[in-house]
Amino acid sequence: MKDLISIIDVKDHVGETVKIGAWVADKSGKGKLQFLQLRDGTAFFQAVVFKPNMIENFGEEEGTAKFDEIKHLSQETSVYVTGVVKEDSRSKFGYELDVTDLEVIGQSHDYPITPKEHGVEFLLDNRHLWLRSKRQMAMMQVRNAIIYASYDFFAKNGFIKFDSPILSGNAAENTTELFETDYFGNSAFLSQSGQLYLEAGAMALGRVFDFGPVFRAEKSKTRRHLTEFWMMDAEYPFVTHDESLDIQEAYVKALIQGVLDNAAYALETLERDTSMLQKYIDTPFKRVSYDAAIDLLQAHENDEDTDYEHVEHGDDFGSPHETWISNYYGVPTFIVNYPASFKAFYMKPVPGNPERVLCADLLAPEGYGEIIGGSERETDYDLLLKKIADFGLDPKDYDWYLELRKFGSVPHAGFGLGLERMVTFVAGTEHIREAIPFPRMINRIQP
């Protein structure tokens, strides 16, 4: 309705009579006063109903009837509420509504998520309703702000949106983590990454990006893993590895700034320390080689405050190692030039050191781990063909990808950012399941 305003906008209407469409999140009261906690998807705030005001507005009989109806409103009843906006210094939100009229739109009976503590499995079983809670609303607002900031960054930096397929006949990375499906009598796989297709896009259109769901059949139950999640991939020609890191750093800082600018209420709801987020914008990200990181971990492995296992050169990092490294530096940290043995086949070797590849993982501080993976891509046809064979992959499945190296191959690089990991980091939340509307995990595919 044209005459409705959003709760988040009431600050612009102090002293004015406004009308809001909302749901009753909670209610309390005594005697002639009722306090309604209203939500509309933009914010939560309090509406105050005073019985004498209702009688003054509607007469004794109708005013009393309206007040009694309000007194018996149940949780999640939908309403139109009319009233005067007032500043309220006692409220975190800073405003409240002095109600002059209320109209019930839709009744709500026996709402299962009552204002008390509930177990996580119960809340996930009722995820379609849990999304209505204050915290989950804030998480979705942070997610939305990151998505919009992504599109804004790519538009301002000359990227073209390039849509890669979700169904594919081959793997981008690890073939053991694929979801396989029948495709008219043949095998097809749900996409792990749009990266290979983005490379084709970059050779045709220049700077390109893709945003969509990807799938990993990882049997992992950690707080960082989902089987279905959203990736923001980018690819660009005529760019080296170091230049790619500059782009990634600018991108992540733009995302954080976008949330600070456009989801401040959500961050306040989540009690996120925004001074830390501002620090990450203002401070250059750290860049540390894989081998230097191993040396650092070995040097500190016997410190009192360490809880990670011993690592040798050639080992991959576990979550405790990533957490310790990023906390040691206190800012997002690029770990560069990993061993080729556990990275993807398409990564270009470090010049003069074929056992290391020109790649980087960006580790977020505060224990949030990897949020970006990127690399410079191999441009030599013969070397790439050999890598495909060395990884036990069928070169025939990658004929089209190899051909990109036959017709005007150029230096190019790119990266992929896991949206839910970025949301978890910026929001300061503990588990990735809250960063997506309907999480898909090894033990959950409903609702």
Curated annotation (Swiss-Prot):
Its main location: cytoplasm. One of its GO terms (molecular function) is asparagine-tRNA ligase activity. It catalyses: tRNA(Asn) + L-asparagine + ATP = L-asparaginyl-tRNA(Asn) + AMP + diphosphate + H(+). Its EC number is 6.1.1.22. GO terms for biological process: asparaginyl-tRNA aminoacylation. InterPro entries: Aa-tRNA-synt_II, aa-tRNA-synth_II, aa-tRNA-synth_II/BPL/LPL, Asn-tRNA-ligase, Asp/Asn-tRNA-synth_IIb, NA-bd_OB-fold, NA-bd_OB_tRNA. It is an enzyme of class 6 (ligase). Homodimer. This is Asparagine--tRNA ligase. It comes from Lactococcus lactis subsp. lactis (strain IL1403) (Streptococcus lactis).
